[in-house]
Amino acid sequence: MKISIVIVTYNRIPALCELLESISRQTLMPYEIIIVNDAGESVVPVKALYPELPIAVINLEKNSGHVAARNAGVKEASGDCIMLCDDDDFFTPGHIEKMAKEIETADFVHSDAEIVSFEEKNGTRYPVSRKLFAYTADYEDMRVFSTYVPSGSMYRRFLHDEIGYFDADVHNYWDWDFYLRAAKDYRVKRVPCASVIYAFSDAGDNQSADLGAKRKQYLDRLSEKHGLGELPTKNFAVLLEEPEMKRREAKSEMVWDGEPVYSRLHRS
């Protein structure tokens, strides 16, 4: 099995190095790592820090947004399976091997995660708070609120040939849209292991914390596309406390030791 990891990055060199460090510690190495630089600062020095990793860099001439950049990456992927990851998230050791085993009986696999708030000290992120993010993934429930974490998820390359690429028209909800399209006709499986560390800012400076008029517009587009009806627009943290979400809470194996990832950026 050849696994292509696709990472979109924009001016997050320290976090990107932590992700690559976590990949270098995996028990199963990917076939290729495609880093799409969305017209940010050069990542060539980052590639040089990890010469043993099969890194290819795509430099976009203008900032195209994360969905278009991700599409550029997956179109270049030549592996049998594609694994996605945001540049500020990272994997625990053994994640890739576990997902490779799970996809043997599926077309699309996604793991649970730990949602972690970090503070940065001397270029390294240290965890301040952490919360298990593990929920049942029944298709009808996923039509109401998506608990799919794209980072660390893996799917067979042919899905793009069958259902297309990521939809920039729904912007923030590209992952929810892709999940629903895939789950409708293909074998999608949740892996009950929190082997992905998902960075989330309590201060609300990332997309998952942001709620605004444009985000509501994208949510409405998603709803119209899939016939989802009126969807909740409450803050992410508030939604997780709703009774329906409490009902969906699931058991999961927690594997992260809570230690920060010290990359080669600060050892070089």
From Swiss-Prot:
Glycosyltransferase among keywords: yes
InterPro entries hit by this protein: Glyco_trans_2-like, Glycosyltransf_2, Nucleotide-diphossugar_trans
Record keyword Transcription present: no
Domain of life: Bacteria
Enzyme class, UniProt record, top EC level: transferase
Listed EC numbers: 2.4.-.-
GO molecular function annotations of the record: glycosyltransferase activity
Keywords: Glycosyltransferase, Transferase
Classification via Gene3D superfamilies: Spore Coat Polysaccharide Biosynthesis Protein SpsA, Chain A (3.90.550.10)
PANTHER family with a match to the protein in the record: GLYCOSYLTRANSFERASE (PTHR43685), GLYCOSYLTRANSFERASE 2-LIKE DOMAIN-CONTAINING PROTEIN (PTHR43685:SF2)
Family designation: Belongs to the glycosyltransferase 2 family.
Entry protein name: Uncharacterized glycosyltransferase YwdF
Organism: Bacillus subtilis (strain 168)
Organismal lineage: Bacteria, Bacillati, Bacillota, Bacilli, Bacillales
